[in-house]
Design a protein with these regions (language model features):
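S-adenosyl-L-methionine
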Residues: 1-188
Length: 188
């Protein structure tokens, strides 16, 4: 029943938005279109996935497939990272460099009581990192630092290959990726 209703709502929204002008700001249709898009985004941000790992329940806001996949593979994608966090002393300070959506920041803060500095330069991931921190009531444990870390003090370009929530593998000050190949910058 839930999938059926979701399908009906999606089709109504698609039909409505296809008739709405895309640029005439004075149009009632345009304003209605913006309103509908805002309501749709609000609904997307209400999707929460809970993952239980070693008795610690973590909540993740999952508005798209990629963020949902990251939450679902939390325990299997980087088992060595989880082992490392488990080996830390309780209350240790942790720097999560490239925190993305905060998967490991959340776990360290919840499981070890760590004070976490979550470095994440992607504007597309910062919103979910903040929402995930809030959903898990860890604002007092996780400090979000919206900058890239480098071995130099400078201003440079952030080469983003992905503009989705949960996107990764971007570079700071370099136009090649982890594999040494030139990256196709999607957003600079």
């Amino acid at each position: 029943m839930r999938k059926f209703l979701k399908s009906i709502i999606q089709n109504i929204v698609k039909a409505f938005l296809s008739f709405a002008p895309q640029k005439d700001m004075t149009s009632h249709f345009y304003r209605a279109r913006l309103f509908m898009l805002g309501q749709f985004q609000k609904l997307m941000m209400q999707r929460i996935r809970s993952e239980d790992y070693k008795g610690h329940v973590l909540k993740f806001v999952v508005p798209n497939y990629l963020s949902d996949w990251r939450a679902q593979t939390f325990a299997s994608k980087e088992p060595e990272t989880l082992e490392w966090i488990d080996s830390m002393q309780d209350g240790a300070i942790m720097w999560d460099v490239g925190a993305n959506l905060g998967l490991y920041s959340l776990y360290a803060a919840k499981a070890k009581g760590s004070q976490v500095f979550a470095f994440e330069p992607s504007v597309f991931n910062l919103e979910l990192l903040a929402r995930n921190t809030y959903e898990n009531k860890l604002q007092d444990k996780i400090c979000i630092v919206p900058i890239a870390l480098s071995n130099q003090t400078n201003f440079n370009d952030m080469h983003m290959i992905n503009t989705q929530w949960g996107g990764a593998l971007s570079t700071f000050g370099e136009d090649f990726g982890w594999d040494g190949k030139k990256i196709n910058t999607n957003f600079l």
